[in-house]
């Protein structure tokens, strides 16, 4: 028997059903949303090292090799592998934080290694506190901090690297405190390793600011490594005697430096010469190290009431011959590290600045200031006491300020928790807060960069909302790793942009209202304010690309096309003109990711290919008319033929500047000449023009990648140097005679030399601009020689 519902009951039940369906939909969506951070079990603030450690733990547990009976093992592992691939990469992590997985459509990944790789090869130094795994973004700052670094460049698959690992760990423990021990994974940071000239593994280099890197070529025993490291440690041990004792002590005390002295008597224990050298290196600039032979200097030791072997630290101003009144620290250990830690703990803390003197002191000098609230937390890391000495040559003083003594001052600076900041000699107006790691080398790098940069900490009182000058403002959150990675690059960019535009940072965890006003939804968000115009930066986190972005705002490389200008410039283009056009929509995440790459590509194609873009949100009906069915839609319009509307659509997977440029150049007529053995001999070797020749093989992948770059080069040097190509598969004897041992190989053949040789000069670059600059430099030198020879005749 049916049941009839009245209207009210029907509406009520319909609402219930709709609510249930909505809840079900939300559950399904949430259940399928794979948050990469939660997949790895890390927070959004996790460091690269924490992400590697979390992934390794999961990889060893979930790897398909260890779960052969689980049909879902492959799929489950792909998920965590994908999460790791994205979060380990700074740029992909930024895209993911901002757009979610939508922003990663061009970076699918999907490959993983065997279980044994993750067990034995992956992150081999991540669990060693004495060894710091350095990444590209922090490497230069670390090795230029002023500390001595010994760095192991290794590859995960290298057996010799694994053979060295146990020794490297023992060595790191042995020299801890004397120098920094680092490691670079060249499997993850290939570009960094290439930049540092690393072409074999393991490669061990010593680095110190102001000196060239020194490669270690000895045997890989711990003793040999220690001996090599000690050659580069600055250590001076003074033998004290009646003749020099008083002057040495008084001179050091006057400079605020104390003495560590070991008094040695025959048959009794005192610090060995090797231990004294190590302590001198560890305490370099902080404490002088000396020793007294009490058998030879009996009267001196007796005057100091020392009758047995003793080691003591004499702080500045210590009374040497009255132990009861003196602040002398007597040391019972013979171990260098134990003595070092005890002395460091007893060194005086940084100067405490008072509220009354703060503004005046900061106005007349550059300062690194530690802010604390009551208890001084810096005491937990006594190594930070080295800062005063290591920053002395930079003319940066180091002090501390207790915010509990003057809360108003800290509140005005937006300091609400313990932190440190650099003040640039203009009082409290110009300062920058440190958001990096609270470890010595990171703070050193920050202080040196900050005092020489032009980055301003912004707040409501100085935010450039209506400033007539252009500003680049970085909206960030201190907990966000990509934000922290961007800050050093902003400092570099600010020095290069000084006088052109100002650079500032705004902490959105403090100034939430300002960030909401500008609709900041992800961190970091970097924006250029130019009076009424606002432009958001979407590029990579590098000073170079920030500068490119600014230059593109001044001189746009991409033509913004309207339906009218599209018809005029593209459809009615001249016979020899070509265009590449990006049809996009501002709300489309892949379009937003593409835009900086599109602009970068356009700059490299200036004079060769016209580049434009069409906003399909603004000109929707026009894009529909042009049959644009997806975003972004990239089209190439070739040299005009009878088919004016002919175009080619880009279907490639990668939408980076290099891939897009190669695709576009592939449609241009060949500018280089295909050479045969006969034409190579007649035109290149016996001809009266300069030639640059690309020796290649059709099956060679790098040759195929280089081909469009060589075509670009041919166009750049047209009229001055001719460009040719030799197919080494078709003409092996020609290539063999030219001494070709690898593909591609590029050689320059210069006319007017004494005699052209088939070997000539090889060019090792694969960048068209670099090759062109090198060629022009060679030709200029050659012309000078020819002119000089003619003058002599």
Curated annotation (Swiss-Prot):
InterPro entries: DnaJ_domain, ER_disulfide_reductase, ERdj5, ERdj5_TRX_C, ERdj5_TRX_N, J_dom_sf, Thioredoxin-like_sf, Thioredoxin_CS. Residues 35-100 form the J domain. Disruption phenotype: Mice are viable and healthy but show enhanced endoplasmic reticulum stress response in the salivary gland. Residues 1-32 form the signal peptide. Its EC number is 1.8.4.-. Keywords: Disulfide bond, Endoplasmic reticulum, Glycoprotein, Oxidoreductase, Redox-active center, Repeat, Signal. CDD domains: DnaJ, PDI_a_ERdj5_C, PDI_a_ERdj5_N. One of its GO terms (molecular function) is protein-disulfide reductase activity. One of its GO terms (biological process) is protein folding in endoplasmic reticulum. PROSITE patterns: DNAJ_2, ER_TARGET, THIOREDOXIN_1, THIOREDOXIN_2. Disulfide bonds join 158-161, 480-483, 588-591, 700-703. Residues 235-350 are annotated as: Trxb 1. It comes from the Eukaryota. A motif (Prevents secretion from ER) lies at residues 790-793. Ubiquitous. Particularly abundant in secretory tissues. Ubiquitous in fetal tissues and tumor tissues. Higher expression in fetal tissues than in adult tissues. Expressed in testis, pancreas, fetal thymus and fetal kidney. High expression in heart, liver, kidney, and testis. Low expression in spleen and skeletal muscle. Its main location: endoplasmic reticulum. Changing residue 700 to A: Abolishes disulfide reductase activity. Glycans are attached at residue 530. Residues 130-232, 454-553, 557-665, 671-776 form the Thioredoxin domain. Endoplasmic reticulum disulfide reductase involved both in the correct folding of proteins and degradation of misfolded proteins. Required for efficient folding of proteins in the endoplasmic reticulum by catalyzing the removal of non-native disulfide bonds formed during the folding of proteins, such as LDLR. Also involved in endoplasmic reticulum-associated degradation (ERAD) by reducing incorrect disulfide bonds in misfolded glycoproteins recognized by EDEM1. Interacts with HSPA5 (via its J domain). Interacts with EDEM1. Thioredoxin domains 3 and 4 are the primary reductase domains. The thioredoxin-like regions Trxb 1 and 2 lack a redox-active CXXC motif. This is DnaJ homolog subfamily C member 10.
């Amino acid at each position: 028997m049916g049941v009839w519902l009245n209207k009210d009951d029907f509406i009520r039940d319909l609402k219930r059903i709709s609510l249930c369906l909505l809840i079900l939909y939300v559950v399904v969506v949430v259940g399928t949303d794979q948050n990469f951070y939660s997949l790895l079990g890390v927070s959004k603030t996790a460091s690269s090292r924490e992400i590697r450690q979390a992934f390794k733990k999961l990889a060893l547990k979930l790897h398909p090799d260890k779960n052969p009976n689980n049909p879902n093992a492959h799929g489950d592992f792909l998920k965590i592998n994908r999460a790791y691939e994205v979060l380990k990469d700074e740029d992909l992590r930024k895209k993911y934080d901002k757009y979610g997985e939508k922003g990663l459509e061009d970076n699918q990944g999907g490959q993983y290694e065997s279980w044994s790789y993750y067990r034995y090869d992956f992150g081999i130094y991540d669990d060693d506190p004495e060894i710091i795994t350095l990444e590209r973004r922090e490497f230069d700052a670390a090795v230029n901090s002023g500390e001595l670094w010994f760095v192991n460049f290794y590859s995960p698959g290298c057996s010799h690297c694994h053979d060295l690992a146990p020794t490297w760990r023992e060595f790191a423990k042995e020299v801890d405190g004397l120098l920094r021990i680092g490691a670079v994974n060249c499997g993850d940071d290939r570009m960094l390793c290439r930049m540092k000239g690393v072409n074999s593994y393991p490669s061990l280099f010593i680095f110190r600011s102001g000196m060239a890197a020194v490669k270690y070529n000895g045997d890989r025993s711990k003793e040999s490594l220690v001996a090599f490291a000690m050659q580069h440690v600055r250590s001076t041990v003074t033998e004290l005697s009646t003749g020099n004792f008083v002057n040495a002590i008084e001179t050091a005390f006057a400079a605020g430096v104390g003495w560590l002295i070991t008094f040695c008597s025959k048959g009794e224990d005192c610090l060995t010469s090797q231990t004294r050298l190590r302590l001198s290196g560890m305490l370099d600039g902080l404490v002088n190290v000396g020793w007294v032979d009490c058998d030879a200097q009996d009267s001196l030791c007796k005057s100091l009431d020392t009758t047995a072997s003793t080691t003591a630290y004499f702080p500045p101003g210590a009374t040497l011959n009255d132990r009861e009144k003196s602040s002398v620290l007597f040391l019972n250990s013979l171990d260098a590290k134990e003595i070092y830690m005890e002395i460091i703990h007893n060194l005086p803390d940084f100067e405490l600045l008072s509220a009354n003197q703060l503004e005046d002191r900061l106005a007349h000098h550059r300062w690194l200031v530690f802010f604390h609230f009551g208890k001084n937390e810096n005491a937990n890391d006594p190594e930070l006491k080295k800062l005063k000495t290591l920053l002395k040559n930079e003319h940066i003083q180091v002090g501390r300020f207790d915010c509990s003594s003057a809360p108003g001052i800290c509140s005005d600076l937006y300091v609400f928790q313990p932190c440190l900041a650099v003040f640039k000699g203009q009082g409290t107006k110009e300062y920058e807060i440190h958001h990096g790691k609270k470890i010595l080398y990171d703070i050193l790098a920050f202080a040196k960069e900050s005092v020489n940069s032009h980055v301003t900490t912004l707040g409501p009182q100085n935010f450039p909302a209506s400033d007539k000058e252009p500003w680049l403002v970085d909206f960030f959150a201190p907990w966000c790793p990509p934000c922290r990675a961007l800050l050093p690059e902003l400092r570099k960019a600010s020095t290069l942009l000084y006088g052109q535009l100002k650079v500032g940072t705004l902490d959105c965890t403090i100034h939430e209202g300002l960030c909401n006003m500008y609709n900041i939804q992800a961190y970091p968000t970097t924006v250029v304010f130019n009076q009424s115009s606002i432009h958001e930066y979407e590029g990579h986190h590098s000073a170079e690309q920030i500068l490119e972005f600014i230059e593109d705002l001044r001189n746009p490389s991409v033509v913004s096309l309207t339906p009218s200008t599209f018809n005029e410039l593209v459809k009615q283009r001249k016979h020899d003109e070509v265009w590449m056009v990006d049809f996009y929509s501002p709300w489309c995440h892949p379009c937003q990711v593409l835009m900086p790459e599109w602009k970068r590509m356009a700059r490299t194609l200036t004079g060769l290919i016209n580049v434009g873009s069409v906003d399909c949100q603004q000109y929707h009906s026009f894009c529909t008319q042009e049959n644009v069915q997806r975003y972004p839609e990239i089209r190439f319009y070739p040299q005009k033929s009878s088919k004016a509307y002919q175009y080619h659509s880009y279907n490639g997977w990668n939408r980076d500047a290099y891939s897009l440029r190669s695709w576009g150049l592939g449609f241009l007529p060949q500018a280089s000449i295909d050479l045969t053995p006969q034409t190579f001999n007649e035109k290149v070797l016996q001809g009266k023009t300069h030639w640059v020749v690309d020796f290649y093989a059709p099956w060679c992948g790098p040759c195929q990648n280089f081909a469009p770059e060589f075509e670009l080069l041919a166009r750049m040097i047209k009229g001055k140097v001719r460009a040719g190509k030799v197919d080494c598969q078709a003409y092996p004897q020609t290539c063999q005679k030219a001494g070709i041992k690898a593909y591609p190989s590029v050689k320059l053949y210069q006319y007017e030399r004494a005699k052209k040789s088939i070997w000539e000069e090889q060019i090792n670059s694969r960048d068209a601009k670099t090759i062109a600059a090198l060629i022009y430099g060679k030709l200029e030198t050659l012309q000078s020689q020819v002119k000089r020879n003619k003058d002599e005749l």
